[in-house]
Amino acid sequence: MKFSPSLLRGTLIKRYKRFFADVELEDGTIVTAHCPNTGAMSGCAEPGYTVFLSESTNPKRKLKYTWELAQTFDGHFIGINTHNANKLVAEALDNKVLKEFSDITRWKAEVTPPTANSRFDFALERENTQHQGIIEYMEVKSVTLAENSKGFFPDAVTQRGAKHCLELARLAESGIKTSLLFCVQHTAIESVQVAEYIDPTYAESVKKAADAGVSLLAASCIIDEQKILLNQTLPLIL
């Protein structure tokens, strides 16, 4: 996913009320940008970080700028916009980036299975040996919480996330293939694990999903101020 037009560079002054970030642009102008991340953003929003903003030309928007990237003091990039995770996965599916999904023939975003109560990020189709299309479902989570080289999810309690895991487990138990993909938008992260110390209920739901046969995996991203690309799988520690 390439950023076009180019992002604007600035310095983070502060993030507040979850959805707002004050940023000083390179020319000294101070602007308020939309923060498209409702999580705790621990370690992602330190005052003084270099940040990168996209600029909207839509006159109806209340905030002209959206916070897309942050760069830590030691140079690591973080994808702030959680909405980009699904875009990155869609692009990776099209380009056969991950071998686990290289035989996907078609996909559709935002789908509610006929027997489920939750909408999932993707319905995927593979062909079996009889060349019949088999549908499976995937949920995507964006990971940005880093401690040393380890990534953790979630960074805040997520009842919705736990519900999704249990729904994936129920589908898996009924014979439908399901997967949970952690999209790592932080270049310092080398492995991923569930943050049981933040949300033990979510951690338990992930374990139940794994026991039910849900496929769990994590994937890293290449990130710089021009682009974000899903790259390769990372170790996932349960």
From Swiss-Prot:
Coiled coil: none annotated. Gene3D superfamilies: 2.40.50.580, 3.40.1350.60. InterPro entries: SfsA, SfsA_C, SfsA_N. Disulfide bonds: none annotated. GO terms for molecular function: DNA binding. HAMAP family: SfsA. Belongs to the SfsA family. NCBIfam families: sfsA (TIGR00230). This is Sugar fermentation stimulation protein homolog. It comes from Alteromonas mediterranea (strain DSM 17117 / CIP 110805 / LMG 28347 / Deep ecotype). The gene is sfsA1.
